[in-house]
A protein has these predicted regions:
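Glycine-rich phosphate-binding active-site loops on the catalytic face of alpha/beta enzymes
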Residues: 89-95, 128-138, 172-195
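Conserved N-terminal beta1-alpha1 strand-loop-helix module at the mouth
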Residues: 1-81, 101, 161-162, 189-204, ...
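Catalytic cores of alpha/beta
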Residues: 27, 71-81, 114-122, 139, ...
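Catalytic beta/alpha-barrel core
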Residues: 15-17, 38-45, 62-70, 83-91, ...
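Amphipathic alpha-helical segments
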Residues: 221-235, 276-284
Length: 318
């Protein structure tokens, strides 16, 4: 899996400035515990390289990159410290080419079609869009993305909990950079619990996990029809008959035959199923890959490998 795909599956890249390299490890731990094993450490401070080194040594699997990289010398320092990707506020062909020569993924900043065309000429398929909100926001990204069908964007600058979902819902955006989960005052106060809580809230906002429906197993279609009819009568819901199941409203799915789960199944809907799957895998859950429902190349649903309290659990794309 290439670096941009890893960032896409994480979804949010925390952009952080660290003044004391000793803060790097507890800050990284707070991000990981909150659900974001990723960070863009900006070269706006003298401690950046040491902070990256401390993070990558303590957490080798964390996706740590260097941001606000302006020169080839900074690229070399970041890579020597263990950075796995480079981000810059603007597009400097010299810096980009240097990254390409040494084999480090780079995501330079762009703000207009001319920048994008330079990026394309350099063979890039993903660029940072910066400063996102000040440069026109999602509306502007959509307007300039159309001619560049193969280009993906990582908007950064002004992205927050109020507009995150709008950005991520556009299929040309692979992830968003943001700092609202790592506010400067919390870092200065070494308030790692606050950062962990803000990070977890950002992840849950992004994924939007909630119960979609509960599945009830039946021995045959007649029993399923009887069960669904009674539930609809009880709740005043409408019945919808499908090939393998009958829905009572949208909250209960009655299977026409014995199905997954000793007691039935629970569907959990999410805003972004690929990101939700990756997140849950990082939490230690395993998936039954043979259960994946893929349509037009896009994952639509997939079951966990193990039942919980006798219920099979599956994710479903909203």
């Amino acid at each position: 899996m290439d670096m941009m795909e890893q960032l896409s599956r994480i979804g949010i890249v925390p952009v952080i400035a660290i003044n004391d390299a000793a803060d790097a490890v507890p800050l990284a731990q707070a991000l990981i515990d909150g659900g974001l094993p990723c960070a863009e450490v900006t070269f706006r401070t003298a401690a950046a390289a040491d902070a990256i080194k401390n993070m990558t040594e303590a957490f080798p699997n964390m996706v740590v990159g260097a941001g606000t990289v302006l020169t080839c010398e900074q690229v070399d320092r970041a890579v020597a410290a263990g950075a796995k990707f480079i981000v810059s506020p603007g597009l400097n062909p010299t810096t980009v080419k240097h990254c390409q020569e040494i084999g480090i993924p780079v995501c330079p900043g762009t703000a207009n079609p001319s920048d994008i065309e330079v990026a394309l000429s350099l063979g890039l398929k993903t660029v940072k869009f910066f400063p996102a909100e000040a440069a026109g926001g999602l509306k502007y990204i959509k307007s300039i993305a159309a001619p560049y069908v193969d280009m993906k964007f990582m908007p950064t600058g002004g992205v927050n909990e109020k507009n995150l979902l709008d950005y991520l819902s556009f299929n040309k955006i692979i992830c968003c950079g943001g700092s609202w989960m790592v506010p400067g005052d919390a870092v200065k106060a070494k308030d790692w619990d606050r950062i962990r809580t803000l990070t977890a809230s950002a992840v849950q906002l992004m994924l939007g996990l909630e119960i979609a429906h509960v599945g009830i197993n039946s021995t045959d279609e007649a029993e399923a029809m009887d069960t669904a009819a009674k539930l609809c009568k009880l709740l005043g819901w409408t019945m919808k008959v499908g090939n393998s199941s009958i829905f009572a409203g949208t909250g209960i799915e009655v299977m026409k035959s014995p199905f997954r789960g000793a007691k039935g199944h629970i569907g959990i809907k999410t805003n972004f199923i690929v990101r939700a799957k990756a997140y849950l895998e990082r939490q230690g859950f395993e998936f039954d890959e043979s259960s994946a429902n893929v349509k037009d190349g896009q994952l639509k649903a997939i079951y966990l490998k193990d039942e919980i309290a006798g219920f099979a659990i599956h994710l479903v794309q909203k």
